[in-house]
C-alpha cells in the first residue's frame, strides 16, 4: 500500500470515528464529545431550523434533547472523499426522538431521515467539520 493510500485510509477512519462520536455525544448528552467534531469556526445549516456555528448548533439542540425522554442518532452509508488536508462526506442519518409523556399519558415518536453533507479539514492534528449542511429527506410523527 502506498503512503498516500495509507494516509487517505487513516483520514477516512478518523472522519468516520468523528461522525460516530457526534451521534454518541448527542445521545449520551456529552456536550464536549459533540463539540469535539467541529472546528471552533465550523458552521452548520440544518434546513430551516438553524444556521450558525457548529458549537452553536450543539447548544441550540441541547435544550430540545434535554426535554426528550430518549433520543437516538444512527448513521448508515457514508461516502468520504479525501483531498489532501480537506475532505467531503455524505452520510445518511436516522434520528429518533421520544417526547416525555404528556398529561394524558401519551408519548410521541419523531423520526427524521436525512443526510449530513460535511466539509472537513485537517488542522492542529485532527480532522473536524468546517461546514455541515443537514438535508432532511423525510420526517414522521407517531
Protein language model annotation of sequence segments:
Residues 73-75, 111-116:
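Short, surface-exposed coil-to-beta transition loops
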Residues 95-99, 120:
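Beta-strand elements of well-folded, non-transmembrane domains
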Residues 31-96:
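A solvent-exposed, acidic/Ser-Thr-rich amphipathic alpha-helical stretch
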Residues 88-90, 113-142:
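Short beta-strand edge/turn micro-motifs at domain boundaries
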Residues 1-28, 32, 36-40:
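Short, low-complexity N-terminal intrinsically disordered segments enriched in polar/charged residues
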Residues 5, 9, 48, 107:
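Charge-dense, low-complexity intrinsically disordered segments
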Residues 101-110:
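Short, surface-exposed loop/helix-turn segments at secondary-structure junctions
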